[in-house]
Amino acid sequence: MKLSDFDFDLPERLIATRPARPRTAARLLLAEGDRIEDRHVRDLVGIFHPGDRLVLNNTRVIPARLVGTRTRGEACAKIEITLMEPAAAGGWRALAKPLRKLKEGETIRFSDALSAEVAEKGETDLRLVFDRAGEDFDAALAEAGAMPLPPYIAARRAPDAQDREDYQTVFARHAGAVAAPTASLHFDRPLLEALAANGVAFTEVTLHVGAGTFLPVKVEDVTTHRMHAEWGEVTEAAAAEIAATKAAGGRVIPVGTTALRLIESASAAGTIRPWRGETDIFIYPGYRFRVTDALMTNFHLPKSTLLMLVSALMGEARIRAIYDHAVRHDYRFFSYGDASLLIPGG
């Protein structure tokens, strides 16, 4: 299975740098079996069935992008930091730009209320230990940090105050992600309430999306690719809700690839169970889904592991046709773009 099998041409004009407003105004490509319909997210009330269960990732994105100053004698250097994940040894793993200007033991000052020491420096990243912890750290980070927009947006514009709302789901509650579960950005409270009134159930799980979600695949044989690990949890209550829906013949529909990867990780034994830990599950064509019946997701990058995931769900040829339709009909791509609802069979 070659990496080139998952390539496609995408006009740059289709890369969204701002989301649709309101959230539910985003377009929705409904693909069920061989059928494609051009709809909008607000139409989901008439698309989902009573008895369906949507699985939502309730992770909360932290303002992980920091700009600080390293002082060495009378010389000062501007340092850009992107937090990646909590480090096992304490502190945070982070990317630094320029990394070469930092030495272990040096301090980076981000604001009057927040500084960090370079505890370890590697070839590609470093470990920072901040001078605050707990709620004090959260408050200082909220003041000094900016939302960590994906590279394909950050290359086109800087993050601003509006991104603090736009790049966060309305049900975000557990802080720890450095990228949003973007399919969930399309939901607002009125849509959630309308779906619930129509008999659609919801289950929340937590997967802290890491910066590794944007890493490119560097091998031509995709089966040899190693996925980054991300921390997640499916509680006992969540597992029971999903199992009950399956037993009743309802559909389990993750909203986003992060929720899908998590519930499939929690179903390694064949049925879903409570689960907590790091997952590096890599889903590509040939994978047999255990609990997922359909998927709501945005449109993904060429040659990405997420494009491989949707190809596993729908079939490679079918996904090529779906993406060709999306490009021809000017759907907006990636994190702030439009959505698709992928339903195999039909």
Swiss-Prot record:
HAMAP family: QueA. Pfam families: Queuosine_synth. It is found in: Cytoplasm. Signal peptide: none annotated. The keyword Cytoplasm applies. GO terms for cellular component: cytoplasm. The keyword S-adenosyl-L-methionine applies. InterPro entries: QueA, QueA_dom1, QueA_dom2, QueA_sf. GO terms for molecular function: S-adenosylmethionine:tRNA ribosyltransferase-isomerase activity. This is S-adenosylmethionine:tRNA ribosyltransferase-isomerase. One of its GO terms (biological process) is tRNA wobble guanine modification. It comes from Cereibacter sphaeroides (strain ATCC 17025 / ATH 2.4.3). Pathway: tRNA modification; tRNA-queuosine biosynthesis. Transfers and isomerizes the ribose moiety from AdoMet to the 7-aminomethyl group of 7-deazaguanine (preQ1-tRNA) to give epoxyqueuosine (oQ-tRNA). Its EC number is 2.4.99.17. Keywords: Cytoplasm, Queuosine biosynthesis, S-adenosyl-L-methionine, Transferase. Belongs to the QueA family. Monomer. It catalyses: 7-aminomethyl-7-carbaguanosine(34) in tRNA + S-adenosyl-L-methionine = epoxyqueuosine(34) in tRNA + adenine + L-methionine + 2 H(+).
